[in-house]
Structures are given as structure tokens and as C-alpha cells.
Amino acid sequence: MAEEKGGKQVLEESAFEEMERDFQGVLHELSGDKSLEKFRIEYERLHAVMKKSYDNEKRLMAKCRELNAEIVVNSAKVATALKLSQDDQTTIASLKKEIEKAWKMVDSAYDKEQKAKETILALKEEIVNLTKLVEQGSGLSMDQHSNIRDLLRFKEEVTKERDQLLSEVVKLRESLAQTTEQQQETERSKEEAEHAISQFQQEIQQRQNEASREFRKKEKLEKELKQIQADMDSRQTEIKALQQYVQKSKEELQKLEQQLKEQKILNERAAKELEQFQMRNAKLQQENEQHSLVCEQLSQENQQKALELKAKEEEVHQMRLDIGKLNKIREQIHKKLHHTEDQKAEVEQHKETLKNQIVGLEREVEASKKQAELDRKAMDELLRERDILNKNMLKAVNATQKQTDLVKLHEQAKRNLEGEIQNYKDEAQKQRKIIFHLEKERDRYINQASDLTQKVLMNMEDIKVRETQIFDYRKKIAESEIKLKQQQNLYEAVRSDRNLYSKNLVEAQDEITDMKRKLKIMIHQVDELKEDISAKESALVKLHLEQQRIEKEKETLKAELQKLRQQALETKHFIEKQEAEERKLLRIIAEADGERLRQKKELDQVISERDILGSQLVRRNDELALLYEKIKIQQSVLNKGESQYNQRLEDMRILRLEIKKLRREKGILARSMANVEELRQEFFHMQRELLKERTRCRALEEELENPLNVHRWRKLEASDPNAYELIQKIHTLQKRLISKTEEVVEKELLLQEKEKLYMELKHVLARQPGPEAAEQLKLYRRTLHDKKQQLKVLSSELNMYEVQSKEYKYEVEKLTNELQNLKKKYLAQKRKEQLQKNKDTAPMDNTFLMVKPNGPGFTGGGFPLRSTKMTF
């Protein structure tokens, strides 16, 4: 089975590899054709989805195989546990039988104990009678002596039987303890087996749950694949609609071309250019539609990106708020710091200004002192000069007035200087007061500065802590800024893409409007050409230019014809490849149908075997329920037997107490016996009887060692029926033991046969396909559905390409016919032109010279910019 699965897997992998190669070949063929670009993208996406589903399927198949292997292992464990439980049931049954035997033996021992009690009571009565006789003092007769001997002998036999029974009771107790221990061990093993079975059942349930989960995942993937296929079908319908639109546009172009062909030869170039513009317009419209689809997709993506960007912007906004809060805290701290620093700077500046003011005032005081000294010196000099003047007054009469004036001036200056000196003194006094006050303020400011330095140090420590926090916050801000930059880059990329697409859209719209405008211009020019047809004077120039243009168009038509032939060959090759692909797909579908039928047969067989196994499992469960009921019944019986056994033990304890009491009474009686002589005689007789009994015992021992009669135990039937019954029970038990051993051998043979059947069934189950067959069947159905869909798509594409090839053939034929018509018209026009040249050579030259200055202006292909009437 594993080899068959491996072979199937190899075949599936080879088929998948072949499909992969075919896919690559189709992609290679489609990559050269831009018109099938959209189809190629959809095809690649479908192939990616198929590959993903194939990988998921492989993974699920591997997991299913693992689960099946674990289920097989667990089923084997369950089977072994069931086998152990069956063995435990057999041991429990055998132990129950042994317990029943033990209870029977206990019952027989109880009966014997009852008989022994009765004999003990009878002996007590006889002892009482004997004591009475002894008290009466009457002599014993021979009959009484013989009775006493018989009683003593009977007493010894009873004591022997009692000892035997006690030993048997001890043995039975030991065997009962062993059986109880064995039963407990079997119950423990049974509980362990049940626990293991429950664990295995739980594991199987877990595996089944996992398998169901995997199956649900697979169904989900199948639904997704169906959705993708539906999307693909919708895209195919859209492509078909677009192709129909293109076909309609082509038909309209053909109609327009037919209308343009009906025009004259002189307007053919304009008509062809108009046709080219219309074709380009159709292409632009198609591209516009594609751009609109792309724009819609981009708008949807932009909306999604906008939502994501909005979420990111909200995160960024939140982070910015956090950053703003942190910045506010940081700014507050910085403001406080700057405020303290400003206060400190102001204090220091004020201190410096005060120092400068003090130094300046000290300098001014020194300067005033120096000025006062200079004034004094000047006063002395003036006094000396006054003396000199007074002395020389008499010498110079003319200089006296001058000197007096100078003296007045100097005196005025002196008074001024003295006033200034007084002012300076007052100012110096004020300055001393100010200096004293400033020194006080300096001391106060020094104290304030020391306090402020302490505050600054404290603030610096706080600033360091805040700076560490700010550093951490800066790290966070940097990380958030990096994330923000990434989001901004993504946003910029999306915005640039959007701008690019919008720019392309605007350019396309501008081109469309430009083309429409050019189309209107061309229509207007065509109208002008229609009006200028009557202008015969420009025919020669136009025909000459038209000839060159026709030659060029002929070359272009040849190139287009060659291109169309090449495209026709390519489409033919593509159609052949598609036909080969179709044949291959049909072959694969036939193989899949055969495989599906085979898998269906195997599935039916597996279902029938599953039903058989289910019925066997139900039967086994019923048997287990019956065994559990029997075990409960046996447990209740064991509990009852244990209680009865405890009761018997209590009875034996009571009997022991009674025996002790009897012995004590016997001792009392022996001490109370007054007649020693009789006791001696009795002792003598007892010794003689003891010798007789010893000789008898010796003879019996010799007879036992060398038995003369093998079936001597049959004599006990009359003498000792209890011993006879015991011997018969032993014989019957031996026979039953032999029969039970034979039954055990038969059961072992049956067990071996059952094990063989179990192993064969296990091998059959191992050969049968599991849930993998159903999975493979689903896979084949899905692949068959996919292939049918692909076949439909390929057939539709084939029809489309056939229609296109027919259209190309029709266009080629049409172009060849047009080329022939153009050649004919060109030759006819050439003949007419030659005839016209031969007829009107000189007049045309004169008219040409006359017309040329006032003729219409031409640009490009000879289209007139204004219409003027020409006169010949």
C-alpha cells in the first residue's frame, strides 16, 4: 500500500512538474504579446494560487499519513489492551472458581466444626457422668473401662481431626489471601488497561479533531480557490467585453475607412491620417479605460493606505502629543534653569556694576583730590602772579586794565572752582554713604549668591536627572521619529505613485483632448480640402507630393503586411500549441476518470470493511459490558464471602475459648480426684492402652508405607463417611482439573486462531486505503473541475484567436485590393498628367509664374492654410 501511495505521489509530482513546464512555456509565449499582458498576469496569479493549494494539499496529505500511522499504532495498543483485559477476565474467572472451591471447603470445614462441637458436647456429658460415678465411688466395670478407652480413643481421633481441620483452615486462609491478592492485582491491571484504553481513545479523539480541523482548513482553501476561479471568470467576461468593444471600434473604423475610400484620390492622405488618428484614439481610449481601472484600483489602494496612514498618523499624533508633553516638561525645566541662570547672571552683573561703580567713584575721588591739588597750585601761582602784577602795575599802565580784567576772571574762576570743590566734597560725602550702603548690599548679595549657588547645585542635580530622562525620551522620540520617517517614506512613495498615476491620467486626458482638437482641425482641413478641390492650379504640386507619399505608404503597407503575416504565423503556432495542450488535457481527464472509478471501488470496499469492523466493535463492547456486570456480581459475592469468613473466624475464636475453658475444668477435675489408687490403676491401664495404640499406629504406619490394599479407602464408606466424601471430592477435583486443563489448551488454540485472524484483518486494513483515498478523490475532482474551466477558457481564447485571424486575413485582402486600386488610380492619374503636360506646357508655366506669388501657403503635407481663388 505504501509503495502504491509512493508511486501515486511520484506520478502526481511528475504531472505537476509537467504542468509547471507547460505553464512556463505558455508564459514565455505570452510575454512577447502586450495585448495579452492582463491575461498573463491573471494566469500567473491563478498558477500561484494552484501552487499554493498544491503545497497545502501535500502538507495536509503528509499530516493525514502521520495521523493514520498514529491511529494504526493506537489501534494496535487498544487491541493489546483488549487482549490483556480478556486475559484478565480469564484469570478472574479462574480465581472465582478457586474462590468457590475455597468456600465449599470452608463450608465443609464448618460442617466438620459443627460435628466436632456436637461430639465435644457429648464428651462433656459423658465426662460429667463419669465424674458423678467417680464421686459416688463405685468401681468401674470392664464395660465401663472399655467405654472409657473407646471414648479416649474417640477423643484422640477428634483432636486429630480438629488439628487437620485447623491446618486446612490455615491453608484455606492462605489460599484465600493469595486469591484476593491475585484478584486485586488483576483489578489493578484491569484498571490500568482501562485507563490506557481511555487515554488511547482520547488520543484518537484528538487526532480525529485535528483531522477534522485540517479538513475544515482544506474546505476553506477550496472555497477560496472557487472564489478565485469566480473572480477569474468575471475577469474573463470583462476581457471578452473589452474585446467586443475593441471589435466594435474596429468595425466602426472599417466603416470610416470605407467612407474615406469613397473620397477622391487627392483626399486619401488626409483620410488615411484621419484613420491613423482614429486608431490611435481608440488605443488611447482603451488605454484610458485601462488607466481608469488602474486609477480605481489605485484609489482603492489609496483609500486603504489612507486608512492605514490615518491610523499611523493617529499613532504619530499620539506620540507627538507625548513628545509635546515631554517637550513642555523639558521647556519648563529649561525655563527654570534659564531663570535661575539669568538671576545668577543678573546678580553677578549687578555685583560687577557695583564693583565698577565703586572703582569709578574711587577714581573720581582721587581725580577730585588731584584737581584740588592742582587748583591749590593754580591759586598759589595766581597769588604769585597777582603779587607780580601788583609789583608791575606801576610799570605798565596800559596793561593794568587788562590785568585787572584777568584778575576778575581768575577770581571768578576761583569762586567757581571753590564752588566746584565744595560740590565735589558734598558729592564725595554722598559717594561714601553710597559706598557704605553698597558694601552692605554687597554682603547681602554675597549671602544671596551663596544661597543661590546651593539652589543652583540642587537644580543642577535635578537637571542631570531630568537630562537622563530627556535622553531616554530622546531615544524614544528618535525611535518614534524613525518609525514616523518610515511611515512618511511609505506615504511619500504612495503619494508619488498617486501623483505619477494622476499625472499619467492628466497627460492621457490632455493627449485625448489634443487628439480631439487635432481631429477637429483635420476635419476642418478636410472641409477646406473639399472647398479647394476646384483649385486646379495646385494639382501638379499636390500630385507630385502625393506620388512621394504614396510610395512611402506603399512601403509602410508592405511592412504592415509582412507584420500581419508574421502575426498570422504566430497565431497559427499558438493555435497548434493550444490544440496539443487540449489533447494533453483530454488525456489527463481520461486518466483522472479512470483513477476516480478505481478510487470509488476502493472506497466502497473500505466502507463495507468499515461496517464489518463497526459491527465487530459493537459486539466486543457488548461482551465487555457483560464482563463488567459479571465482575460486579463476583465482587459482591467476594464481599459477602469475606464477611462470612470473618464470621467463621469469630466462631473459631469462640471455640478456642471454650476449649481453654474445658481444659481448665479438666485440670480442676484432675486436682479434685481424691482416689489416687484408682487413678494409678487407670494410669496403668492407660499406659497399656497407649502401648497397644502405639503398636497399632506402628502397624498402620507400616501398612501405609507398604500398602497391601490400594482401594482400602473404600472401607471408609461405612466407618468414616466424611473421609470417604473428602477422598471422592479430591478425585472429582482431580478429574475437573484435568478437564479444565484440556479446556485451557482448547482456549489457547482458539486464542491463537483469533490472533491469526486479527493479524490477517490488520494486514487487510493496512492494505485498504484510508482517508487519503477520499482526499485524493476530492483532489482529482477539483483538478478535473479546474481543467474543465481551463479548457473552456482555452476554447474561448481559441475562438477569439480564430476570429482575430479571420479579421487579419480580411484586412490583408482589403489592403491588397486597396493597393491594387491605388496603383490603377496612380497610373491613370499619371497618364492624365502626362497628357496635360503635353497639351498645356507653355500656358501652364505662365500661369504658374502668375499664380505663385498670390497662391495659398502650404505646410507639412500640402494642406492650405487659407483658401484663394486662382484665375488662369
Curated annotation (Swiss-Prot):
Residues 106-595, 642-839 form a coiled coil. It comes from the Eukaryota. InterPro entries: CFAP58_CC. Its main location: other. It is found in: Cell projection, Cilium; Cell projection, Cilium, Flagellum; Cytoplasm, Cytoskeleton, Microtubule organizing center, Centrosome. One of its GO terms (cellular component) is extracellular space. Keywords: Cell projection, Cilium, Cilium biogenesis/degradation, Coiled coil, Cytoplasm, Cytoskeleton, Disease variant, Flagellum. GO terms for biological process: cilium assembly; flagellated sperm motility; Notch signaling pathway; protein localization to motile cilium; sperm axoneme assembly; sperm flagellum assembly; sperm mitochondrial sheath assembly. Interacts with ODFP2. Belongs to the CFAP58 family. Has an essential role in the assembly and organization of the sperm flagellar axoneme. Required for the elongation of the primary cilium and sperm flagellar midpiece via modulation of the Notch signaling pathway. It is linked to Spermatogenic failure 49: An autosomal recessive infertility disorder characterized by asthenoteratozoospermia and multiple morphologic abnormalities of the sperm flagella, primarily coiled and short flagella, with markedly reduced or absent motility. PANTHER family: CILIA AND FLAGELLA-ASSOCIATED PROTEIN 58-RELATED (PTHR32083), CILIA- AND FLAGELLA-ASSOCIATED PROTEIN 58 (PTHR32083:SF31). This is Cilia- and flagella-associated protein 58. The gene is CFAP58.
